[in-house]
Amino acid sequence: MRTGRIIKSLSGVYRVDSDGEMFDTKPRGLFRKKKFSPIVGDIVDFEIENVTEGYIQHVHERQNELKRPPVSNIDHLVIVMSAVEPDFSTQLVDRFLVIAHSYGLNPRIVVTKKDMASDSQIERIEKDLDVYRAIGYPVQFVGKNDNIETIFDEWGSGLAVLSGQSGVGKSTLLNAYRPDLAIETNQISKSLNRGKHTTRHVELFERKGGFVADTPGFSALDFDHIHKDEVKDYFLEIQEYGQGCKFRNCNHIKEPQCNVKAQVEAGNIAQFRYDHYVQLFEEIANRKERY
């Protein structure tokens, strides 16, 4: 019996990396009976059938898991945004951060295309990024002339998953780091100011200290698993200052003696962060139940 990590899944076949050796494996029938499917990122025990093939016998417990796209045991969720084409959006950053925290992931922010932005755009973006740095998020603002290897090394060991809307440069980052991958990239649609997703399945690629994955289908952010009363816990500074509110169940909207609103007034919580919190709270509060 050997142990390895699923790095790719295609048509019911799971490619497992076991100490640098690759095996194409299939799950035993017992998984079908349990209606359980292995996913990319899983740590598995498998029996070797021949030199390059085997059967998965056991899936280790997942430390965390994304539903869409399906990937598990993520150490870092890298939120990739671009300075321009498409334009940098703090609202989108905040929505990705909420998703990250809701799944128990460690998020970090990477902004690309610095070389394509004007001085005034860079100044505005840096001002916004300082807000995230002050909260405690690791932030990188990079252009095509930056050392890509250094950017990836800063992420530390383990599995780093790239997330972000289409066209922000996720595949370009990977290609610069690993030119041998030749991942397809797409030009930005001028009419929509965004790209089409070029990555069609989740695959883990080796990097120094671990793996990195690009993720398809990560532009339609899904908050169905989040209750409105949980949203405040996923805005870290709101969660912290919320402990000073008079009422324990304060949602920081219309409640009296709210410390969060007082800290927004005092400038200790960025207005845009509070506005995005309120928008998302109301969006989730007003959604219709799905049956």
Curated annotation (Swiss-Prot):
Its cofactor is Zn(2+). One of its GO terms (biological process) is ribosomal small subunit biogenesis. Its main location: cytoplasm. Keywords: Cytoplasm, GTP-binding, Hydrolase, Metal-binding, Nucleotide-binding, Ribosome biogenesis, RNA-binding, rRNA-binding, Zinc. Residues 63-221 form the CP-type G domain. GO terms for molecular function: GTP binding; GTPase activity; metal ion binding; rRNA binding. It is an enzyme of class 3 (hydrolase). Gene3D superfamilies: Nucleic acid-binding proteins, P-loop containing nucleotide triphosphate hydrolases, Probable gtpase engc, domain 3. GTP binds at residues 112-115, 164-172. The keyword Acetylation does not apply. Zn(2+) binds at residues 245, 250, 252, 258. It is found in: Cytoplasm. GO terms for cellular component: cytoplasm. Its EC number is 3.6.1.-. Binds 1 zinc ion per subunit. Belongs to the TRAFAC class YlqF/YawG GTPase family. RsgA subfamily. One of several proteins that assist in the late maturation steps of the functional core of the 30S ribosomal subunit. Helps release RbfA from mature subunits. May play a role in the assembly of ribosomal proteins into the subunit. Circularly permuted GTPase that catalyzes slow GTP hydrolysis, GTPase activity is stimulated by the 30S ribosomal subunit. Monomer. Associates with 30S ribosomal subunit, binds 16S rRNA. HAMAP family: GTPase_RsgA. This is Small ribosomal subunit biogenesis GTPase RsgA.
